[in-house]
Amino acid sequence: MSNTWDDVWASDSDVETERSPDLLKLRENHSKRGYLDGIVSSKEEKLQEGFNDGFPTGAKLGKQVGIIMGILLGLRTRFGDEDEGLSKAYIDAQKELRINKVLSKSIFDPNFDLQEKHPLITKWTDIVNTYCEKYHVPSIQ
């Protein structure tokens, strides 16, 4: 003899036919809610973990992009009218140094670590340093 309190959802097959539609709906809602709560909790943990791991790298790259763009803007403001190549370089840098390109998965290893120097940062640091030398302005270290 089965005790009704052994299974609060009364999921024994012989009891299944006696269940009301409201009880079935309640059980379904609770199951879905539990499933969703579990997924949300897991995603929040993993998202925070990923943010904590990736923030230092992203912040460092963002700072480097800011330095590159700031120097290019200053040079373009001062010398852009007479140097068409400099103006074009600034526009190209705006396109190439967008966040989705700087933080592209293809640039990182499977653990999302940079193996060497960032190719776009290296490229644009070299370009900026060339213009800095041309106009006798301190270059990026």
Curated annotation (Swiss-Prot):
Q: Name one GO cellular component term.
A: cytoplasm
Predominant place of localization? cytoplasm
Question: Any idea where this protein resides?
Answer: Cytoplasm; Nucleus
What is one GO biological process annotated to this record?
Answer: protein maturation
Q: How does it assemble?
A: May form a complex with LTO1.
What does this gene product do?
The complex LTO1:YAE1 may function as a target specific adapter that probably recruits apo-RPLI1 to the cytosolic iron-sulfur protein assembly (CIA) complex machinery. May be required for biogenesis of the large ribosomal subunit and initiation of translation.
The record's similarity note reads:
Belongs to the YAE1 family.
Q: What is this protein called?
A: Protein YAE1
Name its species. Answer: Saccharomyces cerevisiae (strain YJM789)
GN (gene name): YAE1
